[in-house]
Regions:
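Extracytoplasmic small-molecule ligand-binding "clamshell" domains
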Residues: 30-96
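A ligand-binding cleft/hinge motif common to bilobed small-molecule-binding domains
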Residues: 79-80, 97-105, 153-157, 179-182, ...
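Flexible hinge/capping segments at coil-to-helix
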Residues: 122-142
Length: 256
């Protein structure tokens, strides 16, 4: 009788131990969210060693931690980001992505977390001294941009479609800047922060004082993924209020 009771006690104890182990394993394992980006846009995203680093990866990591997810980052071509997240290939995109009405037709955006400024890079001796020179009647410059970016979209509308020059699209900002250095194009339209990095790395270039356009950056998601957008926005709001996100941006873009 005592042996039977002891066996039952041991069986119950073993079952309880296995159950607790299972619960612990569930508690330790987190669902992973995949963020797609194009890591040629410093300081928002760039490659350092074998890691994708920058403002967007750090904000994404903080937001995912707040939501209770692990984060995986995929570096891919910029012009495949919208279609990739829209099809469900990625959970979300952060890539210095500007909110536009056209993109809103394809994806959902989070709340804005940063503001970008489009500027113009030229050679030191360039005849282009302002945005007005580039957009003047009779102007006939070749303008470099990164393909599928808002810089490309604006330049096509303002310059090529208006008969004021030609727009050359490149896979990334670095290739556009190298084309400028090598005399193949007359200027590059790109966001201000990566522009600073490219000018610092290439002697003989400068950024024009006049701003081309100001725009908002946000993360984007598949149109029907409203639950994740809401969670992301809630975490974003908390991390902005407690100073985490401003500190990340300040780390890479110190206030002047």
């Amino acid at each position: 009788m005592e042996a039977t009771i002891m066996k039952k006690i041991l069986a119950v104890a073993l079952t309880l131990a296995l159950t607790l182990t299972a619960f612990a394993a569930c508690a330790e394992s987190k669902e992973t969210l995949t963020m797609a980006t194009n890591a040629s846009f410093p300081p928002y995203e760039y490659v350092e060693g074998d890691q994708v680093v920058g403002i967007d990866p750090e904000i994404a990591a903080a937001v995912c931690e707040k939501m209770g997810y692990d984060l995986e980052i995929v570096d891919t071509e910029f012009d495949s980001l919208i279609s990739g997240v829209a099809s469900g290939k990625y959970d979300f995109v952060m890539a210095g992505m500007t909110v536009t009405e056209e993109r809103k037709q394809m994806v959902s955006f989070s709340n804005t977390y940063a503001t970008g400024v489009q500027v113009i890079i030229v050679k030191d001796d360039s005849p282009i001294t302002s945005v007005d020179d580039l957009l003047a009647d009779g102007a006939n410059y070749t303008v470099g941009t990164q393909n599928a970016t808002t810089g490309y979209i604006y330049a096509m509308s303002d310059i090529e479609d208006a008969g004021k020059g030609t727009v050359a699209a490149f896979p990334n900002g670095n290739e556009a800047v190298m084309a400028l250095v090598n005399g193949k194009i007359d200027c590059v339209i790109i966001d201000n922060e990566p522009a600073k990095a490219y000018v610092a790395a290439n002697e003989g270039l400068k950024i024009l004082d006049s701003t081309y356009v100001v725009e908002d950056y946000a993360a984007c998601f598949a149109k029907d993924n409203t639950e994740l957008v809401e969670k992301f926005n809630a975490a974003l709001e908390e991390l902005t209020a407690d100073g985490t996100i401003p500190a990340i941006i300040e780390k890479y873009i110190p206030a002047e």
